[in-house]
Amino acid sequence: MNGERCSNPDCGSLTQMTSKIYWCDECNIPIFDMDCPICTSKGRYIASDIRPVFPEENMLISLILTGDALHYQKSSAWNGNNNYIIDGKKVKLSVSTINKWPIEKVKELKDQYDMNAAKLDYSYFDEYKRAFIAANTDRYNAITEEAVHYVQQYKDRYSIDDMMVSFSGGKDSTVTSHIVNTALGTNKVLHVFGDTTLEFPYTMEYKKRFNRNEESQGVRILTAKNREKNFEELCDVVGPPSRVMRWCCTVFKTGAIQKTIASAFKDKTSILSFQGIRHSESVSRSKYERESDSPKITKQKVASPI
């Protein structure tokens, strides 16, 4: 794990900058130390970022790559650096090729998935998940402690009323919320949820479940939403969003959030927004500072604990 000290003199903690993830062939799981904490075997470098492949996705890639819905069901399946990693071996799957499939082939894949969905089994997934957690507990505790200390150093500079968590309903903002609540010992920090009107139903359902969770009960979530514009109607007028013209974010996200913040914080001259930005998300985000002034929203300081 490479790292550097936080440039903030009030902090000075070790900031995790990049990850090196290894594979333990003995335990058949990803590990963050070269020596496996469980079996002490030497790991081999596999990726710089990793995420689990859940059984539903596992079944899909099994169908796409082999035609057998259960082919990888008992395997340790992960995704890192845009590669699937099955039992420690990188497996290529071209998303661009799949995007070019005729609709009939996509429907056929969906039919095959639906026919086999009842066979989904979480037991193997859960087994590898438990092993992964056991092997990487020390690292988890270390980065959690560092992130908590990072948030705590803002207590002398901002009051709770001057802070907010930018909450998207995704895993990164959920972790950020947990870190902030833990570090400050309160769930009184305002959360702002940007409803772009294009959110997945699962995201909206998770937002409801988040508030029912014991830890986050009582967290106040304000929803920022542009209720005056319609996405499809604007597409007819100016064309769909593209890399050249990204009007969607400005109209349906940034603009709505800025209005909500202006209303919620009113006469505040400086507010602190905790955001779930990670360096490993993309090349552009790998260049972000951990603390910066928001380029899009005025009088907002952005801090990224994770």
Regions found by a protein language model. Name each.
Residues 2-34, 38-45, 49, 55-67, ...:
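ATP-dependent adenylation/nucleotidyltransferase module used to activate substrates
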